Amino acid sequence: MKPGIHPEYKKVIVRCACGNEFESGSVKDELRVEICSECHPFFTGRQKFVSAAGRVDKFNKKYGLK
C-alpha cells in the first residue's frame, strides 16, 4: 500500500431511524441508517411469512390438478 493515499479508518457512531446507536468503523465521519438489527422484522421476531398456498390451490382448481 502506498502511504498517504488511503482514507483514515476510524470508529464512528451509527445512528438508526429508530433511535438506536452503535459503534462501527468507517472512513466517513457519521453514518445514518434507516433500519438496524434492533428494528428489522427478521431480528425482532415480527416477521410475516407470505403463504402461497392460496395461489397454488387456485392454480390446481383452475387446471384440475390434485
UniProtKB/Swiss-Prot annotation:
Cofactor binding, note field: Binds 1 zinc ion per subunit.
Keyword Ribonucleoprotein: yes
Record's keyword terms, sorted: Metal-binding, Ribonucleoprotein, Ribosomal protein, RNA-binding, rRNA-binding, Zinc
UniProt record, GO biological process: translation
Domain of life of the native organism: Bacteria
GO molecular function: metal ion binding; rRNA binding; structural constituent of ribosome
Binding site for Zn(2+): 16, 18, 36, 39
Needed cofactors: Zn(2+)
A GO CC annotation given for this chain: ribonucleoprotein complex
Assembly notes: Part of the 50S ribosomal subunit.
Family in the record: Belongs to the bacterial ribosomal protein bL31 family. Type A subfamily.
Record's function text: Binds the 23S rRNA.
NCBIfam families to which the protein is assigned, alphabetical: L31, PRK00019.1
Name of this chain's protein: Large ribosomal subunit protein bL31
Provenance organism: Geobacillus sp. (strain WCH70)
Taxon lineage: Bacteria, Bacillati, Bacillota, Bacilli, Bacillales
